[in-house]
Every structure is written in C-alpha cells, then in structure tokens.
C-alpha cells in the first residue's frame, strides 16, 4: 500500500517530497488520479505505507500539510485515510 499525500500544486508537491527525502523517507511526485482530484490539475506525493505516519510527522514539523491523505491499496482502490470509504 501507499500513502498519497494530495498537494495543491506541483511546486508544493516537489517541496514536500524534498523535505521527506532529506529526512530519509522515500517519496515520489505523481499527478493525482482524476477520480480523487476535485480540481483539473493536482499532484500527490507517494510514500510507502511503512513510512506514512512518520512522513506526516516530518511534514507537520516542517510546517507543510497535505490537502488530503489517501491510501492506495494493492488492488488499486483508493480510500481516504481516516474515513475508510472508497473514492476511486
């Protein structure tokens, strides 16, 4: 599984990924799937599940916060982190 940290812009996603990488957390930037984006162009920072909680703590400490936190399951379904409802 992966955490998908929704960001408001490509620049914000790149900054978020850079902060995580510097802290030793593997992170990649990708366009958000249309099924989870309520805007035309959104980006996500992808983080392995095992680093998800740590990534959120690092970002909070850096003053960065994702718009939404999603979890992409191995079967491809995407759920909101706290709600558990499928949104894909």
Residue spans of the language-model regions?
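Amphipathic, hydrophobic secondary-structure cores in small proteins
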Residues: 1-4, 8-11, 17, 21, ...
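Generic non-transmembrane alpha-helical segments
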Residues: 16-19, 23-25, 54-62
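C-terminal structural segments of small proteins and small subunits
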Residues: 49-88
């Amino acid at each position: 599984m992966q955490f998908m940290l929704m960001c408001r812009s490509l620049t914000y996603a790149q900054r978020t990924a850079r902060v995580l990488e510097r802290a030793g957390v593997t992170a990649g930037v990708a366009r958000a799937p249309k099924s989870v984006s309520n805007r035309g162009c959104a980006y996500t920072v992808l983080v392995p599940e095992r680093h998800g909680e740590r990534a959120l703590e690092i970002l909070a400490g850096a003053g960065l916060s994702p718009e939404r936190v999603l979890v992409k399951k191995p079967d491809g379904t995407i759920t909101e982190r706290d709600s558990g409802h499928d949104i894909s």
